[in-house]
Amino acid sequence: ELQQLSKQYSNIKLLQLDVVCENSIKKVVKEVEEIVGDKGLNCLINNAGINVLASLEEVTAETMLTIYETNTVAQLMVSKAFLPLLRKAAQLSTGMGCHRAAIINMSSLAASMQLVQANEMFLKVYPYRIAKTALNMITRCLAADLKSDGILCISLHPGWLQTDMGGNMAPMQVQEAIPGILSVLDRLGEKENGSFLDWQGETLPW
């Protein structure tokens, strides 16, 4: 589907990235820099993620570390690598938001510590939800650290979607969530910096 879109729209550039490979990250940063030039990068969406079903009885240290590396550590390393391009974009505008410079970390409702009991269906995904909770802390740290640069950072729950990871039991198709997600991104401003939002723009509890 992406290849078809890139053929239809010349402004869509497809780049391959392995988020857990430092050399791959460096390569993609250079490729993006060649595309955006002096304008910098306005919006980085950290969307990579993996999941393995693992209850308390099934979870292993190896599984925990594998999920944590991809869903948490890699998001921070990718954000760090793209900082020069984000800062370059931030210098060309004012205010806060995707129109200037923003980091969007794709999180999950499963990461909410306050809603653990309300979301018992997620209890069998220890590695995933713990990694996403840690990702939310990265969001908070980046939001505070980069505020002076004019770079916004939020965590976004896109909804439970029918994807390879979400499965066929998910209540929504990707096409249903995209308009809401784009609307949320378009409305982001300083007051949303460091927040945890869902695809409808509602604030979620940490």
Model-found features: residue ranges?
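Conserved hydrophobic beta-strands of the Rossmann-like cofactor-binding core
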Residues: 41-45
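C-terminal helical subdomain
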Residues: 148, 155-158, 167-206
